[in-house]
């Protein structure tokens, strides 16, 4: 039976990288009897605003709700500005509507050959390996707010509930327990200032103690963690959890460690991937890069996002791992886009990965 994948290319480079993800998945389907896909394309973001006036058309949301998984390219661009209707509203809405409460962003080196591209010294960057787990549907991004209506006052509010924090803590614990020995959990907050952070810290501590006593959790203030991330990133190896906005910031900081935003994938899940069939939305960590010429964007992050989809949502661990291996082989061979010091185009990198994964699975 084919897996139904809704593809939301989005804006600018999102169109190109979505094509490359489909290319490698179709290559896998040629050699793996289990891997059969039905791709449905829909609009989101600025392209959706241009066509329909809405950043997330009803038909796109309805299709996503019926799909086995969603692949998303990238959303946004200066064309749509910061007006009342913005591309990013489509992202926030689909996350909320699909109850995608946990965003997973691995931070590691897809290949050791990329160490020299890190802005950090190799001796500091080598061995960096953690997963940032972001609470995705609560906090200040979804709290009450007031716009400046001419009185010169605007505000946003952060609200978290105990069940919301428990849920994201259980996701972190599940991921930690997939390793032997289990990985440590780092919980980042601002408990010395914010009431919401004090609830966060208390709830994380209680949940781990009562439900996962075999795990260790370490609490770190977010500003201190940001410093550690640059000074000694391997100190944070393991699973990192924090609130929506803090994770948005810290994960972008972490994303530059491997040398390019074009390398890091992400998964947004609606449940624990304990059966390898959790519903999820998969997208690269980078944005839509509107200034990048055609054929220059690195498709690796999008392709690795597809690998995460295979493993976490489609119960195709063998195929997902083969795709990750193919990416490593291609990068090691020197086939790279310009952000990695190479001269290959987007499609050439995709072609090479598609060829490599077929050879691995054949």
UniProtKB/Swiss-Prot annotation:
| Pfam families linked | Iso_dh
Tell me the organism's taxonomic lineage.
Eukaryota, Fungi, Dikarya, Ascomycota, Saccharomycotina
Is the keyword NAD assigned to this protein? Answer: yes
Per its UniProt record, what SUPFAM superfamilies does this chain match? Isocitrate/Isopropylmalate dehydrogenase-like (SSF53659)
Q: What is this protein called?
A: 3-isopropylmalate dehydrogenase
Tell me what organism the protein belongs to: Zygosaccharomyces bailii
The record describes how the cofactor is bound as:
Binds 1 Mg(2+) or Mn(2+) ion per subunit.
Name of the coding gene? LEU2
Q: Which cofactor does it need?
A: Mg(2+); Mn(2+)
- Under which main EC class is this enzyme filed? oxidoreductase
Cited NCBIfam families: leuB
């Amino acid at each position: 039976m084919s897996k139904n994948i809704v593809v939301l290319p989005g804006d600018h480079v999102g169109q190109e990288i979505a094509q490359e993800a489909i290319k490698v998945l179709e290559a896998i389907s040629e050699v793996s009897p289990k891997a059969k896909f039905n791709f449905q394309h829909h609009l989101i973001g600025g392209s959706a605003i241009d066509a329909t006036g809405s950043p997330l058309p009803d038909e796109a949301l309805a299709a996503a709700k019926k799909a086995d998984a969603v692949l998303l390219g990238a959303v946004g661009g200066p064309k749509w500005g910061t007006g009342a209707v913005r591309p990013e509203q489509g992202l926030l809405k689909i996350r909320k509507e699909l109850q995608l409460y946990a965003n997973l962003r691995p931070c590691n080196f897809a290949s050791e050959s990329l160490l020299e591209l890190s802005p950090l010294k190799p001796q500091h960057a080598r061995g960096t390996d953690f997963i940032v787990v972001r609470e995705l549907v609560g906090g200040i991004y979804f709290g009450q707010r007031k716009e400046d209506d001419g009185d010169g006052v605007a505000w946003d509010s952060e609200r978290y509930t105990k069940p919301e924090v428990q849920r994201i803590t259980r996701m972190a614990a599940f991921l930690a327990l997939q390793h032997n020995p289990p990985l440590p959990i780092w919980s980042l907050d601002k408990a010395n200032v914010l009431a919401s952070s004090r609830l966060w810290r208390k709830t994380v501590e209680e949940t781990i103690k009562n439900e996962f006593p075999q795990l260790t959790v370490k609490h770190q203030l977010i500003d201190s963690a940001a410093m550690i991330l640059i000074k000694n990133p391997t100190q944070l190896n393991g699973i990192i959890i924090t609130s929506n906005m803090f994770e948005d910031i810290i994960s972008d900081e972490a994303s530059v460690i491997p040398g390019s935003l074009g390398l890091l994938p992400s998964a947004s899940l609606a449940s624990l991937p304990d059966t390898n069939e959790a519903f999820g939305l998969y997208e690269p960590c980078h944005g839509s890069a509107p200034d990048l010429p055609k054929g220059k964007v690195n498709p690796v992050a999008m392709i690795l996002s597809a690998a995460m989809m295979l493993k976490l949502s489609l119960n195709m661990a063998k195929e997902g791992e083969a795709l990750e291996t193919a990416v490593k082989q291609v990068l090691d061979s020197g086939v790279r886009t310009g952000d990695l010091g190479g001269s290959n185009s987007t499609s050439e990198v995709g072609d090479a990965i598609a060829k490599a994964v077929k050879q691995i699975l054949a």
